Each structure stands twice: as C-alpha cells, then as structure tokens.
Amino acid sequence: MGRAREMGWMAAGLMIGAGACYCMYKLTMGRSEGNELEDEEEDEWEDGQDLDEEEADNWFDFTAMARPWSEDGDWDEPGAPGGTEDRRSGGGKANRAHPIKQRPFPYEHKNIWGEQSFKSFTCILDLNKCVSTQRKKRFTKNINAGFSLSPNISKHLASLSVVGNRSPTPHPTVREKALFVPENPNSSLENQGQIKMSIDEVCRETLLCCCKSFLQQAGLSLLISMTVINNMLAKSVSDLKFPLLSKGSGCAEVRGLEELMSLSEKPVLVGEALAAQMLSSFMCLFTRSGSREMLVEAISP
C-alpha cells in the first residue's frame, strides 16, 4: 500500500515538473519570437531609410552625371561609338576591352538644320525690317544633309535665293531667275550648267539695275564653290570677267576679294584660268581711284 502511494506521488511530481517545463518553454519561445519581430521591424525601418538615402544619392548622381558627349557633340568618354569599354568578363579573368557599337538616335548627337527649319527661319527674318538683320540673313549658312553637293555650295544656293527674294530691283524677272535655283540640286553636269546660266543672267541684269551687287556676290560665291568640284565650270566661270569686282559696290567688292583670296591658297583646284582672273581683278582694283582702301581691308588679317 505504501509502495503504491509513493509511485502515485512520483507520477504526480513528474507531471507537475513536465507542465512547469512546458510553461517555461512557451514563455521563453514567445519572448524570443517577440524580439525577432521587433528586430525585423527595426531592420525594415533601417532598410527603408537606407533606400531613401540611396535614392537621394542616385538622384544626385543622375543630375550631376557628365554626358557621354561634349558640347561640340564629340564622344569623349568610355562607351562612345566606335570606342572601347572596360567590363568584368567573369570567371576571375581580368578586365577586357569590348568594342561598343554605334548607338542610335537620340544618343547620336546631331546638329544639322533641315530645309524646313531654314525656311521657317528666313520667314521670321522677313518680318524684320532692320537693314543689318537683312544683310546678315543674305549670307546665312544652310547646311542640309539631304543636299548631295558640298555644304559650302548649299550655303550659297540658299543665300542666292534669299538675296533674290529681298532684291530691291524693279524688274521681277531678275528675282524669278534668282529663285530659279533648285532647292535640292544634284551633282549632274546638266543641272550645274542650268544653275550657271541662270546666275550669269542674274548677275548681268542686276549689274544694269544697280542692285548694290549683293545678288552678284552670292552668284559669284556659288560659281567659285562649284569650280572647286567641277573642272568644266572652272573654264566657263572666266567668261564672266568678274563684273562684280570691276563695277560693283564697295562692300560686295571686299567680299568678292575675300572669296578670291581663299581660292589663291588652292591653285591646284581652281586652275590657271581662274588664277589669272584673280590677278587681273586685283590689278584693276589697285589702279582704280578709291579702291586701294578696299584692297587693304580685304587682304588685312
């Protein structure tokens, strides 16, 4: 009887001890889970602050980041078209230079005026009655990538059309012939011959109308530019005898002299006929009364 009672008390003690251990275990686990939740919340809050700081840093980097091209449109940093860029090739290998392909627009920096942009620009300037503005507009550069001729010729074609449109001559035929120059010329000999015939007539008729010779100067500049790329026109241009330089206005004479002096640096391109005309024009101006000052102004640096 006593033995059974002892066994009962022992079983009860074991059950009470097991219950106490279980309660202690639950209390300990609950406290640990609470601490972990608090730690996770603190970590999330700290991560959020780190992300905000990183976003601020990234925003600063994007606004202060240097462009891959300079103000002139030239790529001057790694990653430029046709350049190389250092990349980690992986596998513990050293850095290698990988070629970079040409990047498409808008990464390709372009600064070319289109034909429509130039027309809009000239229309705006037409509304301006200032004499100096109109004079500058007469020699505005129009460089269009669609022109098959050189940019210099395209510039003079545009100048000739603008000058013809603003010409104060009373004869409408002169303006029509000046505007007859096609907007998108090609390099064919037939088309160049038509341009030359039109300019010849414009120069001669404008000379009779005393049109300040600006239209003549634009035509002369175009012809000189075309002689550089076409030997046939180099021979025919001497037939004009440069009436601009012998009978034109002072400002146009100086501009014509500047054109001829620029050609004197390239005698191989312009040929002997044009070089002889240049020399005779210089002599004619030098012997004329009141022309020496213009000659000094033209040849001075």
Swiss-Prot record:
GO cellular component, one term: mitochondrial outer membrane
Ranges annotated as spanning the membrane: 8-25
Region Disordered, residue ranges: 69-101
Keywords annotated in UniProt: Membrane, Mitochondrion, Mitochondrion outer membrane, Signal-anchor, Transmembrane, Transmembrane helix
Mitochondrial intermembrane face of the membrane: 1-7
Tissues showing expression: Highly expressed in the developing neural tissues, neural crest derivatives and hind limbs. Also widely expressed in the adult nervous tissue, especially in the forebrain, including the cerebral cortex, hippocampus and thalamus.
Compartmental location: Mitochondrion; Mitochondrion outer membrane
One Pfam family of this chain: Arm_2
Positions in the Cytoplasmic compartment: 26-301
Annotated membrane topology: Single-pass membrane protein
Function: May regulate the dynamics and distribution of mitochondria in neural cells.
Similarity comment: Belongs to the eutherian X-chromosome-specific Armcx family.
Protein's name according to its UniProt entry: Protein ARMCX6
Organism: Mus musculus
Lineage: Eukaryota, Metazoa, Chordata, Craniata, Vertebrata
